[in-house]
Structures are given as structure tokens and as C-alpha cells.
Amino acid sequence: MNISKKVFHLFLAAIMAFSFAACVSVVQAAPFTAPQKLDPYLYYMEYADYAPDLTTGEHVKLGFACSAVRNGNFYGRNLDLDYADVPEFVIKIAANEAEGRYASIGLAAILTLKSNEFDKVSEADLLALPNITFDGINENGVAMNCNVAPAIDLDFATLRSTNYGKPRIHAVSVVRYVLDHAESAAHGVELLKNMDIYGGYGSWGLHWMLSDEKETYIIECIDGELVVRNDTDNIMTNFYVNYGSYSKYAA
């Protein structure tokens, strides 16, 4: 073997070794703790960082009813799944001052798997999991949740955009975005007015209840517009608050 071939082989070996080391270092540096199983359906994880993906949630399995309630400093919801056997996660996100992100804690679920299929969850899935946070509260006391709502009487195509030309965000990722960046409920509303919200849960729309210690808002995408209502009932179900015949079932 001549000198040039030896040099080439040594160079190739070095590249392979470096690549392997880099892969190992990436695995070791995963910015979240290993899922801690709290019961057959619930896990707990802490994140130093995550992979923001505002397109998450384009195709999410449906089939449940839910209500959200706020009473003073108490904020809660029920989630009446008709297929309750899914892995759910309590997700604690660390603050990141450089990225303007506040600390928060919330709930997410992988609705396309059964609880006994947890071994099918990849590291990439876990890294992106915070994007599908359904409910949560941040360090400023801003609490938010999303519920599905029937879009039968709406032109659902118009729900694909609320503010054309602004940065786009999938409806499923709205809670995560607000928890990360909102200083108050009113600030959360202003943040969403500057985003183009699109999508839903399959053929269903989504709406949100956003609260802090002072006030509550119901936020909905109606025929291509973001509609915000300052709400004094402090309750939201699976029916639109700001639209037609459905609004009478809102609370």
C-alpha cells in the first residue's frame, strides 16, 4: 500500500471515529430526563430544551370530550377519553432567558399509541413532545388549555389561516407557544394576534381558554379570523363560545 492510500485510510478512520463520537455525545446530551413512570398511563419528564415545531399536530386521533374550569387560583379540566389507554406525560420546561422562554409545567399525550406501546416512542418523539401540550401554566401564572369544538357549520377551509402573511403556527402548538412567551393572559392574546393560526384536530376545530390571576379569555378561530372574548363564566366546553347556535352550549 502506498503512502497516499495509507493517508486516505487513516483520514477515513478518523472521520468515522469522530462521527461515532459525535453521535454518542448527542445521545448523552439529550435535553430531557428519562421518562419516569408514575402509573400505567402517566409519565413525568423535565426538559432543559426541546425542538420547537409549529407544524406539529396536523393529523391527531380524535374521540373525546372535555371541559376547562377556572375558579380563583384553581384551574383544571377533565378529559373524557373514549380510549383512555394512551401514554400521557407531565412535562416541566425550564426557562431560557436567551430565547425569551418562561418556565412552565403542562400535560401532553401521544394519542396514536396505547400505554403498552411505549417502546415505540423514539427520542425524536420525546424531543418534540412539548409541542403538543394540551394544558399548562407558566412561571408568570398564565394558564391555558385547548378543547376540540365541532366545525360542521363553519367553512373549515377558512380555519387554515387567521392572519395571512404572519408567522404560521399550528393550532395544536398554540398552548406551548403562549406558555413559553406570555407575561400575562392579555399578552398571550396579543401574541396570537400576530400569528397565523391554522389546522385543528382532523375535521374538528380547536379553541382555547387563557387565564391569569386577573382575567380569562376564550380564543377561537372563526371563519378565518381570531375571535377573542373576555370571559366571566370561567368555563369552556366542546362548543364554540363566539359562533352561532353552538354558543349557547359553551358554558
What residues fall within each predicted segment?
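Hydrophobic core
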Residues: 16-24
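Glycine-centered signal
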Residues: 1-2, 24, 244
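Bacterial N-terminal signal peptides that target proteins for export
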Residues: 1-11
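Acidic/proline-rich low-complexity IDRs
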Residues: 9-11, 106, 110, 225
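N-terminal mature-domain region immediately after signal-peptide cleavage
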Residues: 23-186, 193-202
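Extended amphipathic alpha-helical segments with heptad-repeat/coiled-coil character used for oligomerization
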Residues: 202-251
